Amino acid sequence: MKRRILLVDDELAILLTLKAILEMHHFEVETASSAKEGAQRLTKATYDMVITDMRMETETAGYDVIRAAKAQPYEPAVAVLTAYPSLGSDWKTKGAHSLLVKPVNTDELLRQLEHLLSMHQLNKGKNGKNAPLPRPDKTAKAEKKAI
């Protein structure tokens, strides 16, 4: 069974590139081009993970997607994708589990997503809730391709 990801970003090139990469690696991917559309999709389908850009319609539109994801009974893992990593740890306090910085290379993206999905599933199994997840180690070799 393919794992389902909702990808939310207002940049069409990012959406299409990430969707193609993730589908080549056996993920089922749906996309949304705004926080509003992403929040609506979260209520109409079930996802294993949500990856959202932070800055879309507004500087903090990604937080709307995070809130919508956290409100779902199926508790998807949540990752923030941003070109502006100066968010500090605010993304954690808002409920996201991982921060992905654009441009991200393919190997690093896949490694982080696999780690996040594994840890999220393990934590859901232990306590039925989303617990903070440990960061993956940084020693994996990174492919030169960047998104």
What are these regions (language model features)?
Residues 11, 55-57:
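The short loop immediately C-terminal to the conserved phospho-acceptor aspartate in CheY-like receiver
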Residues 12-30:
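Two-component/phosphorelay signaling modules centered on CheY-like receiver
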Residues 31-49, 57:
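Acidic, metal-coordinating helix/loop segments flanking the phosphotransfer/catalytic sites
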Residues 40, 60-75:
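Short amphipathic alpha-helix used as the core "switch/output" element in two-component signaling
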Residues 63-64, 83-101, 111:
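Alpha4 helix (beta4-alpha4-beta5 surface) of REC/receiver domains from two-component response regulators
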Residues 79-81:
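Hydrophobic/aromatic residues positioned on beta-strands within the core alpha/beta folds
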Residues 104-115, 121:
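C-terminal output helix
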Residues 119-147:
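CheY-like receiver
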